[in-house]
Amino acid sequence: MYLRLASKQSLNKNNNMRLFFSCFLLLSIFNVFSQETTTLENTSKVKIDSLYREDQFYFGFTYNTLTNKPEGLSQSKLSTGFSLGFLRDMPINKNRTVAIASGIGFSYNNYNQNLAIYKSDQAPTYSIIDPETSFNKNKFSQVLVEVPIEFRWRTSTYESHKFWRIYGGFKLSYLIHDRSIFEDAQGKIIVTSNKDFNKLLYGTYISAGYNTINVYAYYGLNSLFKSAKIEGEPIAMKSLNIGIIFYIL
């Protein structure tokens, strides 16, 4: 009788141990799955809540042409420009694919042409260089502070920096330095701080492209010159600049 009772107690003890280990194993497995689910949920939340911005720094290169030119004026050499600046990106929709942006930048524009600029009695004078006249260089250049404001559409996502974009806007530019130079075999004539240049320029622009490569075009809405005349006629030339632009960060 005693042996039967001891055997029964031992069997109950073994069953209790098995039950304890089974419960412990189930709790451990549940805890692991719970931690993985929480990690995935947190990762998902980070991506959804990320308030990213795009294309806040830019630099570009342009080929500069002149429109509304006086009769006889031509551009015979390559005229180039360079610009760089900062734009604050401000998304206006939930997916952050539509935005407005505004900022500040600098540009340098160079125009090679055959409009000679001289100074006579401290006042600038202008003339079209005769085609038979030999000269080495004739150009004017400008350095401007730019204030662009633009509307932006793009296919960007938080995960990728490769996307299509179309940006268009309006730009104010303030002239801070100008220089005209005529050079021939006899020497150079240099004119700076020409009061006939328009100090405040404005125009529209557009840029479009994918990832790194974007085409850019700017059209000036007012004349480069404010009060310059040639043979009694106002010089009302405007700028048309076409090139490429790069956006980063």
Where are the language model's segments positioned?
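Bacterial Sec-dependent N-terminal signal peptides
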Residues: 1-41, 246-249
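Short glycine/proline- and aromatic-enriched beta-strand/turn motifs that initiate or cap beta-hairpins
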Residues: 35-89, 249
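Short loop/turn motifs that connect adjacent beta-strands in outer-membrane beta-barrel proteins
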Residues: 43-54, 91-98, 156-164
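Residues that define the transmembrane beta-barrel architecture of outer-membrane proteins
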Residues: 53-55, 76-82, 141-147, 198-202, ...
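Transmembrane beta-strands of outer-membrane beta-barrel pores
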Residues: 61-67, 104-112, 153-155, 170-178, ...
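Residues on the lipid-exposed face of transmembrane beta-strands in outer-membrane beta-barrel proteins
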Residues: 84-90, 104-106, 145-153, 168-172, ...
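Predominantly the C-terminal beta-signal and adjacent terminal strand-loop region
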Residues: 193-249
